[in-house]
């Protein structure tokens, strides 16, 4: 996800079985949220010595935050709550803790992983 100080924007897509079903029109995004096979991965890092990585270009401005997270986070909590946490917390470590706590409080039954990286400007920004 990319957080621009106001809202989170999904900048990747899941490599899951249900995402393939959604993309092919077999099921809706709403049906995918409760599909019994929603956690089946079609591609993942560490499953093979060779992986196919998706690449792209995203405008990343000074102050923007990239949020990498597992489905234990994004699959269990409201996106608006994540935006509220990122808007109100300037310390990234504390924001990670708060996001993790919120996902667990929302009932996540999966592992919860979150990494935040902030563009602090400077060379290469």
What annotation goes with each model-predicted range?
Residues 1-2, 12:
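A short macromolecule-binding patch
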Residues 2-3, 78:
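Cytochrome P450 core scaffold surrounding the K-helix E-X-X-R motif
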Residues 3-7, 119-120:
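Short acidic-glycine loop/turn motifs at beta-strand connectors
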Residues 6, 13-14, 82:
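Residue-level structural signal for beta-strand termini and adjacent loop
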Residues 13-62:
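Conserved, helical-rich catalytic subdomain that frames metal- and/or nucleotide-binding sites
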Residues 40-49, 56-85, 100, 104-106, ...:
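Conserved beta-strand-loop-short alpha-helix elements that form
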Residues 87-95:
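Short, charged, surface-exposed loops that flank catalytic or proteolytic processing sites
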Residues 122-125:
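Intrinsically disordered or compositionally simple regulatory linkers and C-terminal tails
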